[in-house]
């Protein structure tokens, strides 16, 4: 089955039992592919004695700690085929992950993102406010996770404006004009959680001005660590934004540069959902066995997308719990889950959190 054929499947209407069969087959195909094209990956699997006979289910596929992409060059393409290099967010002194993409994988990332996000926003492109500054996307050959997020989500915008200038100052006059020009239309806002709080919400609150974004949709992600430290819960975040601009349709997402494209969107009930093209496995920290619904553990993310690098099964540094399977009240099939935050002593990784650490 080609990835184009997989993308033709509905992002949220494949029941988990059927999806398990697809995942097991395609993850094993990717494992064989990367063993044949990435010597370091093959050596790791040889070292643990992995054989195909052991892999009956998705959870049987060996995972790589996501941190390995900071320490090693892991790619399954020759250097001449590198189309784009993605880098993770990182504070000063931290190593960053480098993810090597060929043209096909980069294209699949964008197509996958469109399939997932369009389920939430609709298929029409919308007037769009990017809550960031223009300079973040200037170097398109060496993208940070922040720049990739901005550029990736920009595809959903018909007319776009940046809410901040390069000094990270809110452009209130431009915002007023943009909102007035699109009065009565649905507007899409996108940004990273801490930057929205620091440079959009706080600036609006200080100005005492209330913008009318009551028909808008806000998508945000990138880490909650700094806001948690400031005792701002997701509920308080949503409530505060509604107070200053009337927005009530707010959706968080969970994702990482190591699996760009396969993000997990928050539904109307406040649950993070994995799509048909990826999955989440919760593992116990003691022995990495699979935890049942409701039990906290370390999140593993799997994706059918990565062809140019061995990132199809990754153990994250995040703690979470599975909330249910195929039975979310929103009607979407598959697993839905909650993220509690970083494992203690893990590095800052999210775009929001690493940006917050620099200011």
Model-derived regions, located:
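Active-site glycine/GP-rich loop and adjacent strand/helix microenvironment
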Residues: 1-14, 18-33, 140-141, 150-359
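Active-site diphosphate/adenylate-binding microenvironment
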Residues: 17, 21, 36-87, 95-102, ...
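Helix N-cap/coil-helix junction residues
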Residues: 50, 122-123, 209, 247
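Ser/Thr-glycine-rich phosphate-binding loops at phosphate-binding pockets of nucleotides
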Residues: 85-95, 193, 256-259
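Short, conserved beta-strand segments within well-ordered enzyme catalytic domains
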Residues: 87, 129, 188-190
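Internal, well-ordered alpha/beta segment that forms a basic, Gly-enriched binding/recognition surface
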Residues: 92, 109-166
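A short, flexible beta-alpha/helix-coil linker loop
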Residues: 94, 135, 223-226
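"Short basic amphipathic alpha-helical interaction patches in structured regions
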Residues: 98-107, 143-146, 204
């Amino acid at each position: 089955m080609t990835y184009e054929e997989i993308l033709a499947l509905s992002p949220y209407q494949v029941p988990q039992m059927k999806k398990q069969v697809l995942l097991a087959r395609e993850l094993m195909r990717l494992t064989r592919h990367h063993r044949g094209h990435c010597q370091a990956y093959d050596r790791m699997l040889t070292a643990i004695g992995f054989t195909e006979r052991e892999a009956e289910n998705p959870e049987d596929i060996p995972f790589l700690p996501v941190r390995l992409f900071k320490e090693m060059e892991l790619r399954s393409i020759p250097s001449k085929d590198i189309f784009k290099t993605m880098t993770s967010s990182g504070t000063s002194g931290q190593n960053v992950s480098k993810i090597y993409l060929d043209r096909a994988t980069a294209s699949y990332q964008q197509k996958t993102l469109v399939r997932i996000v369009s389920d939430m926003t609709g298929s029409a492109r919308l007037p769009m406010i990017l809550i960031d500054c223009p300079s973040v996307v200037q170097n398109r050959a060496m993208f940070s996770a922040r720049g990739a997020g901005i550029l990736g989500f920009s595809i959903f915008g018909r007319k776009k404006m940046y809410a901040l200038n390069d000094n990270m100052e809110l452009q209130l006059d431009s915002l007023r004009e943009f909102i007035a020009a699109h009065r009565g239309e649905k507007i899409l806002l996108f940004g990273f959680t801490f930057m929205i709080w620091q440079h959009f919400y706080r600036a609006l609150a200080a100005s005492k001005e209330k913008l009318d974004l009551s028909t808008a949709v806000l998508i945000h992600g990138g880490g909650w660590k700094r806001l948690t430290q400031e005792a701002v819960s997701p509920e308080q975040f949503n409530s505060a934004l509604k107070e200053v601009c009337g927005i009530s349709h707010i959706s968080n997402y969970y994702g990482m540069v190591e699996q760009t494209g396969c993000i997990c969107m928050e539904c109307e009930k406040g649950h993070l959902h994995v799509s048909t093209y990826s999955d989440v496995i919760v593992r116990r920290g003691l022995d990495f066995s699979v935890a049942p619904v409701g039990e906290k553990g370390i999140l593993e993310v799997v994706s059918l997308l990565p062809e140019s690098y061995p990132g199809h099964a990754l153990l994250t540094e995040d703690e979470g719990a599975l909330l249910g399977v195929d039975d979310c009240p929103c009607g979407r099939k598959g697993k839905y889950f909650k993220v509690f935050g970083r494992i203690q002593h893990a590095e800052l990784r999210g775009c929001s959190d690493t940006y917050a650490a620099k200011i």
